[in-house]
From Swiss-Prot:
The lineage of its organism: Bacteria, Pseudomonadati, Pseudomonadota, Gammaproteobacteria, Pseudomonadales. S-adenosyl-L-methionine binds at S183, A216, P217, G218, G219, D235, D255, D271. Monomer. This is Ribosomal RNA large subunit methyltransferase M. The keyword rRNA processing applies. It comes from Pseudomonas fluorescens (strain ATCC BAA-477 / NRRL B-23932 / Pf-5). It is an enzyme of class 2 (transferase). The gene is rlmM. PANTHER family: RIBOSOMAL RNA LARGE SUBUNIT METHYLTRANSFERASE M, RIBOSOMAL RNA METHYLTRANSFERASE FTSJ DOMAIN-CONTAINING PROTEIN. It catalyses: cytidine(2498) in 23S rRNA + S-adenosyl-L-methionine = 2'-O-methylcytidine(2498) in 23S rRNA + S-adenosyl-L-homocysteine + H(+). It is found in: Cytoplasm.
Length: 357
């Protein structure tokens, strides 16, 4: 099991290779990363048998930026018939697993395999259970089978608590018909990723206030309003009338980069299309000067050196807060609903709850 297999957004294979190789070097795990363009996956081949396991144990999956899902294991070729026997034989030296996910890569070819996986899962699950390889136990490793085709599969393991929350790292979120744009799903997914579900009622509730910079037409504002917050929407463009009719939104025709609230708010969110360094500076200002306690801001990525640019900006933010003695939790992820961008979440850890704005 010396291969780490990683899912990602198509076109970002190089970023995954750069990121995982960076971490491997820091953890002294010898190996090399490889990927083909637009395949929605990458591999890190370890030179030592326990390398992939050490790499996974040394990293927290939610803190990785570009990987959507990962597993350690290896590829096997499958026959046209009786694939289950071949898989069972390969699993002979695997530990007993507590759950099973069948996955495909996020490409057109991968999606065509989805129906095959749905049909194949039930008989495979039955055979694994009968062989004593699969039980219902969340504390045991998850068995992940990623089908590259009907004849090739990556068979791997991942800890359920240190891997993606959803198969392939793709959330099953339903677009709310009332929301004025599909961008609303970006913010909802960000909350799922950065905020534990059992903390939503504490950190996303109706007594809170929020600011949406570059709000029009209101996709992100809708999420704040849906949690009952009073929202200041800052944009020179028009907001959806349905949002204004809620009575929870104040629309200010102003520049999102110059607006500052009169009183601190709980949340600031921003999805303005701008150079990433400028949006990162917004985070530094709003969190650093105490204008908000938590913030979600998207950073639009350059065409080249995308991982290097994100890493540089995150280090700048972290070092700046350390120098000022400000305690902040910093997270960054390329979400499924992100495109040429990543989503940053910052939470101020040394501020009391602001008074109502």
């Amino acid at each position: 099991m010396n291969t780490l297999f990683i899912h990602c957004r198509p076109g970002f294979e190089g970023e995954v290779c750069s990121e995982i190789a960076d971490h491997a070097a820091r953890l002294n795990v010898a190996g090399y990363a490889k990927a083909k363009p637009s395949t929605a996956c990458a591999e890190f081949i370890c030179t030592e048998d326990d390398g992939a396991q050490r790499l996974m144990q040394g990293l927290r999956f939610p803190e990785l930026i570009f990987p959507r899902q990962w597993a350690r294991g290896g590829f096997i070729d499958l026959p046209e018939t009786d694939r289950i026997s071949v898989i069972l034989a390969y699993l002979a030296n695997f530990p007993q697993c507590g759950s099973l996910w069948l996955e495909v890569v996020d490409t057109n070819d991968g999606k065509e395999l989805s129906n095959f996986c749905k049909k194949f899962e039930a008989p495979l699950r039955k055979a694994l259970t009968a062989a004593g390889k699969l039980v219902d136990d969340a504390t045991k490793p998850r068995l992940l089978l990623t089908f590259k085709s009907g004849r090739e599969v990556f068979v791997g393991l991942a800890d359920a608590g240190n891997s993606a929350m959803w198969p392939m790292g793709i959330p099953r979120l339903k677009f709310p018909r009332e929301a004025p744009s599909r961008s609303t799903l970006k913010l909802e997914e960000a909350w799922h990723h950065f905020i534990p579900r059992d903390q939503w009622d504490e950190r996303l509730h109706g007594d809170m206030t929020g600011v949406d910079l570059g709000a029009a037409p209101g996709g992100w504002t809708w999420q704040l309003v849906n949690r009952g917050m009073l929202v200041t929407a800052v944009d020179n463009g028009p907001m959806a009338e349905s949002l204004m009719d809620t009575g929870l939104v104040q629309h200010l025709m102003a520049d999102g980069f110059t607006y500052k609230p009169r009183q601190p708010v709980d949340w600031m969110v921003c999805d303005i299309v701008e150079k990433p360094a400028r949006n990162a500076a917004l985070l530094e200002t709003w969190i650093g000067e105490g204008h908000c306690r938590e913030a979600v801001v998207n950073l639009k990525l350059p065409m080249r050196q995308r991982y290097a640019e994100v890493k540089r900006l995150l280090e700048r933010i972290e070092e700046g807060f350390k120098a000022r003695g400000i305690r902040v939790a910093i997270g960054c992820k390329q979400l499924y609903h992100d495109r040429e961008e990543v989503t940053c979440h910052l939470r101020r850890l040394d501020l009391k709850k602001p008074k109502s704005a």
